[in-house]
UniProtKB/Swiss-Prot annotation:
Family statement: Belongs to the plant LTP family.
Lineage: Eukaryota, Viridiplantae, Streptophyta, Embryophyta, Tracheophyta
Signal peptide range in chain numbering: 1-24
InterPro entries to which the protein is assigned, alphabetical: Bifun_inhib/LTP/seed_sf (IPR036312), Bifunc_inhib/LTP/seed_store (IPR016140), Plant_nsLTP (IPR000528)
GO molecular function: lipid binding
Annotated function: Plant non-specific lipid-transfer proteins transfer phospholipids as well as galactolipids across membranes. May play a role in wax or cutin deposition in the cell walls of expanding epidermal cells and certain secretory tissues.
CDD domains on file: nsLTP1
Domain of life from the UniProt record: Eukaryota
Keyword terms of this UniProt record: Disulfide bond, Lipid-binding, Signal, Transport
SUPFAM superfamilies for the chain: Bifunctional inhibitor/lipid-transfer protein/seed storage 2S albumin (SSF47699)
Disulfide linkage: 28-76, 38-53, 54-98, 74-112
PANTHER family in UniProt: NON-SPECIFIC LIPID-TRANSFER PROTEIN 2-RELATED (PTHR33076)
Protein name (record): Non-specific lipid-transfer protein C, cotyledon-specific isoform
Species of origin: Ricinus communis (Castor bean)
Amino acid sequence: MKNVVFSVLLLLSFLFCLANTNEAAVPCSTVDMKAAACVGFATGKDSKPSQACCTGLQQLAQTVKTVDDKKAICRCLKASSKSLGIKDQFLSKIPAACNIKVGFPVSTNTNCETIH
């Protein structure tokens, strides 16, 4: 009987650990969709971030649950920014303009792996 109880507890512990390690970070498709309305401002074409930009980023911020989520979002934004011609002088202003606290410097040069 002790072996059965031990085996069940071991199995439950394994399943619990497995469930916690398989939580996926925020996918780039979600990041791109939520941040798409910000491209006009981030490239210097618009004079301020649109309401759609701020709403999308606020929704994205609500999905952040872990440090890995922050790092994933950072990596996605960096990858997209290269192909879109994003300019740091505009990009860095978006969090304050949209009243979003990100907890790390917003730049195309941010080292995403140092985020904690």
